[in-house]
Design a protein with these regions (language model features):
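The feature preferentially marks the first beta-strand/turn patch immediately downstream
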Residues: 7-9, 14-56, 106, 110, ...
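A local structural motif
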Residues: 29-40, 188-194, 212-231, 295-298
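Second-shell loop/turn segments in exported
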Residues: 37-39, 96-102, 108-111, 148-156, ...
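Extracellular/periplasmic solute-recognition and catalytic clefts
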Residues: 38-96, 119, 124, 250-255, ...
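Short helices/loops that flank or line small-molecule/ion binding pockets
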Residues: 46-57, 107, 208-217, 230-245
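Acidic-aromatic pocket-rim loops
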Residues: 78, 82-86, 232-298, 385-390, ...
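Append "and occasionally in soluble cytosolic enzymes with long acidic Gly/Pro-rich linkers
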Residues: 104-212, 216, 288, 316, ...
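Extracytoplasmic/peripheral linker and loop segments enriched in polar/acidic and small residues
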Residues: 110, 122-127, 222-232, 261-340
Length: 417
């Protein structure tokens, strides 16, 4: 009888405690500090800066040129946050078609690493706010130190004479000849189309400089200037075999810092991830690399038995990705974001910077709404399945849903949301 009473009391106690425990662990303690978040497009960073200073914008989700916020007077009325995580790269079209494509030759693509002056990009174009890159791993990436020996083994330095030598040798092997200073193949002058982002001053300058380098080697360069919308049509939306483009100046952002990055190598180098020329459209020519696919899939699904094996896989994938040179990384950048002085609670996350999903959740304003300026509002596929392929729409999308887990803004460890 005593035992029955004991168990009855225990069960009743659990029934009393359980609801309060469930309520405590299932619901957030409080909501956000604002009731509404507005996103407004501002293409011009200088205009956006003044709007933030005047209080018409609370935050601007795009970098502001360092020379605009150098002095104490320049920073009156605003807060400035610095963040790493963004980068620049050059996408190369390696397709094979009826028209001769010089970039279908792997060794020729690899030579482009000597044609780009990475130090010039960092020191001059972005004013020292960045570092040179040769792979998708920047110096602040969690895995950078474990693969630094692999990266340094390439010994890349700006050497246009060496690039010219390699490119010339490969073109001659392919049957091309130089006539009056320009390369020809089968009696036709070789023309390359460089799609250059005109809406980004840095990428525009990179494209202009590299175009001159290619012209010095003997290529006829057609410069096609355009913005994000045009890039999605011409570069990412066309059949690479049609050769509407050969080179493209890319820019990358980050949604956060990952302590164990399982996606980066697949995203930047591997065909299976659908982010390489052709994008796995069955009606297009597609870049293929079974070796890279095999390695990056193992990293993606954690198919390794130790940290040492994981590092080995990362080294192999990095070496192959850089050697193939379909996507050539140029520089990482330190972005400077501006916020109005009256806004508190900004989260400057590692990798993502101020545009992290945690900023709108935590930001405090004297008003019920938070007004955020963005560089672009791309009207693409707002679809969580194979959509949101640009950083601008992702900055909005990541505030519209709660994933099961997300990387901690300061440690990179996965935390439950």
């Amino acid at each position: 009888m005593f035992a029955m009473k004991f168990w009855l009391v225990t069960i009743l106690a659990l029934l009393v405690l359980l609801p309060s425990f469930m309520l405590h662990t299932s619901f957030a303690e409080k909501g956000t500090f604002v009731n509404e978040v507005k996103f407004i497009q501002y293409l011009d960073e200088n205009t956006a800066l003044e709007e933030v200073r005047n209080g018409n914008l609370d935050i601007y989700y795009f970098r502001v040129s360092s020379d605009r916020i150098e002095t104490e007077k320049d920073r009156e009325g605003i807060q400035v946050f610095e963040s790493t995580g963004g980068s620049y790269s050059m996408l190369v079209n390696p397709s094979i078609s009826e028209t001769f494509n010089p970039f279908s030759i792997t060794e020729l693509r690899f030579a482009l690493n000597y044609l780009v002056d990475r130090n010039l990009i960092v020191n001059e174009l972005i004013g020292g706010y960045g570092n040179t890159m040769i792979s998708n791993y920047g110096i602040f990436a969690a895995d950078y130190l474990s693969i630094i020996d692999e990266l340094e083994s390439f010994h890349f330095k700006y050497n246009p004479a060496l690039a010219n030598k390699i490119i010339s040798e490969e073109l001659e092997k392919a049957g091309a000849e130089k006539i009056d200073g320009f390369w020809h193949h089968n009696g036709k002058q070789i023309e390359i189309t460089f799609f250059i982002r005109s809406d980004d001053p840095v990428r525009k300058s990179i494209g202009e400089i590299l175009s001159s380098e290619f012209e010095n080697i003997g290529f006829k360069v057609n410069k096609d200037f355009g913005d994000l919308n045009k890039a999605f049509v011409v570069v990412y939306g066309s059949n690479p075999a049609d050769q509407k483009w050969h080179l493209y100046t890319e820019g990358w952002g980050s949604s956060g810092f990952a302590k164990y990055d399982s996606v980066g190598l697949a995203q930047m180098y591997s065909p299976w991830f659908s982010n390489m020329p052709g994008n796995n459209d069955l009606t297009y020519w597609n870049y293929k690399n079974d070796y890279l696919d095999s390695i990056t899939k193992k990293i993606y699904v954690s198919d390794f038995a130790s940290a040492e094996e994981r590092t080995s896989l990362i080294k192999q994938a990095t070496k192959e990705g850089v050697s193939e040179s379909v996507r050539i990384f140029l520089a990482s950048k330190t972005d400077q974001y501006v916020v109005n002085d009256d806004i508190d609670g900004i989260i400057n996350a590692l990798g993502a910077g101020v545009p992290t999903r945690f900023t709108p959740i935590n930001a405090k304003s004297d008003n019920d709404s938070l007004v955020i300026g963005v560089k672009q509002i791309y009207q693409g596929a707002w679809n969580p399945v194979a959509g949101f392929s640009d950083v601008y729409s992702n900055q909005i999308w990541l505030n519209l849903y709660d994933p099961g887990v997300f990387s901690h803004p300061f440690t990179g460890k996965m935390i439950p949301i």
